[in-house]
Amino acid sequence: DTDTSGLVIAARTDEAYAALRRQFRERKVLKEYVALVRGRTPEHGKLEHYLMHNPARRGQMIASSNATARKGLRPMRAITQYRRARIFEEYTLLNVVIRTGVTHQIRCQLAAAGFPIAGDKLYGGEDPLLARHFLHAAALTIEHPVGKERIRFEAPLPPDLRQTLALLA
């Protein structure tokens, strides 16, 4: 997602690229995010949906509890787990782990659960709190393409998201 901050991974060789693609395909990559959502979530949860492109709104996904697709739509399974990190008056800060990798997965699933991401105009409407959605790719754990050891990369929250949390505290 364009406005999502945080980690992006790149490979320097074709072999490393192939190894990373395999890890993503086999769901061996641990992808961790931080999200600020509107409302108060349960302490933890697991969201399981089938996501499809919304034919009525270009660039948006829709969530369904079953794999039955509307005509011309291809449902993709999405699994998201979250744990509450901090509660604010009208918002909740979450640590999120995705087990799959579908476009807009976190944004769409949290909105479908009734907890849209703060600042997310596509899935949550207007939010005066910030100019972009509060979703940050905080950590990524992979197997090194050559050495095979597990490596964890982390990215701290950027200044605008830290400032948003300071305003809420």
Model-identified regions with their sequence ranges:
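RNA pseudouridine synthases
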Residues: 2-169
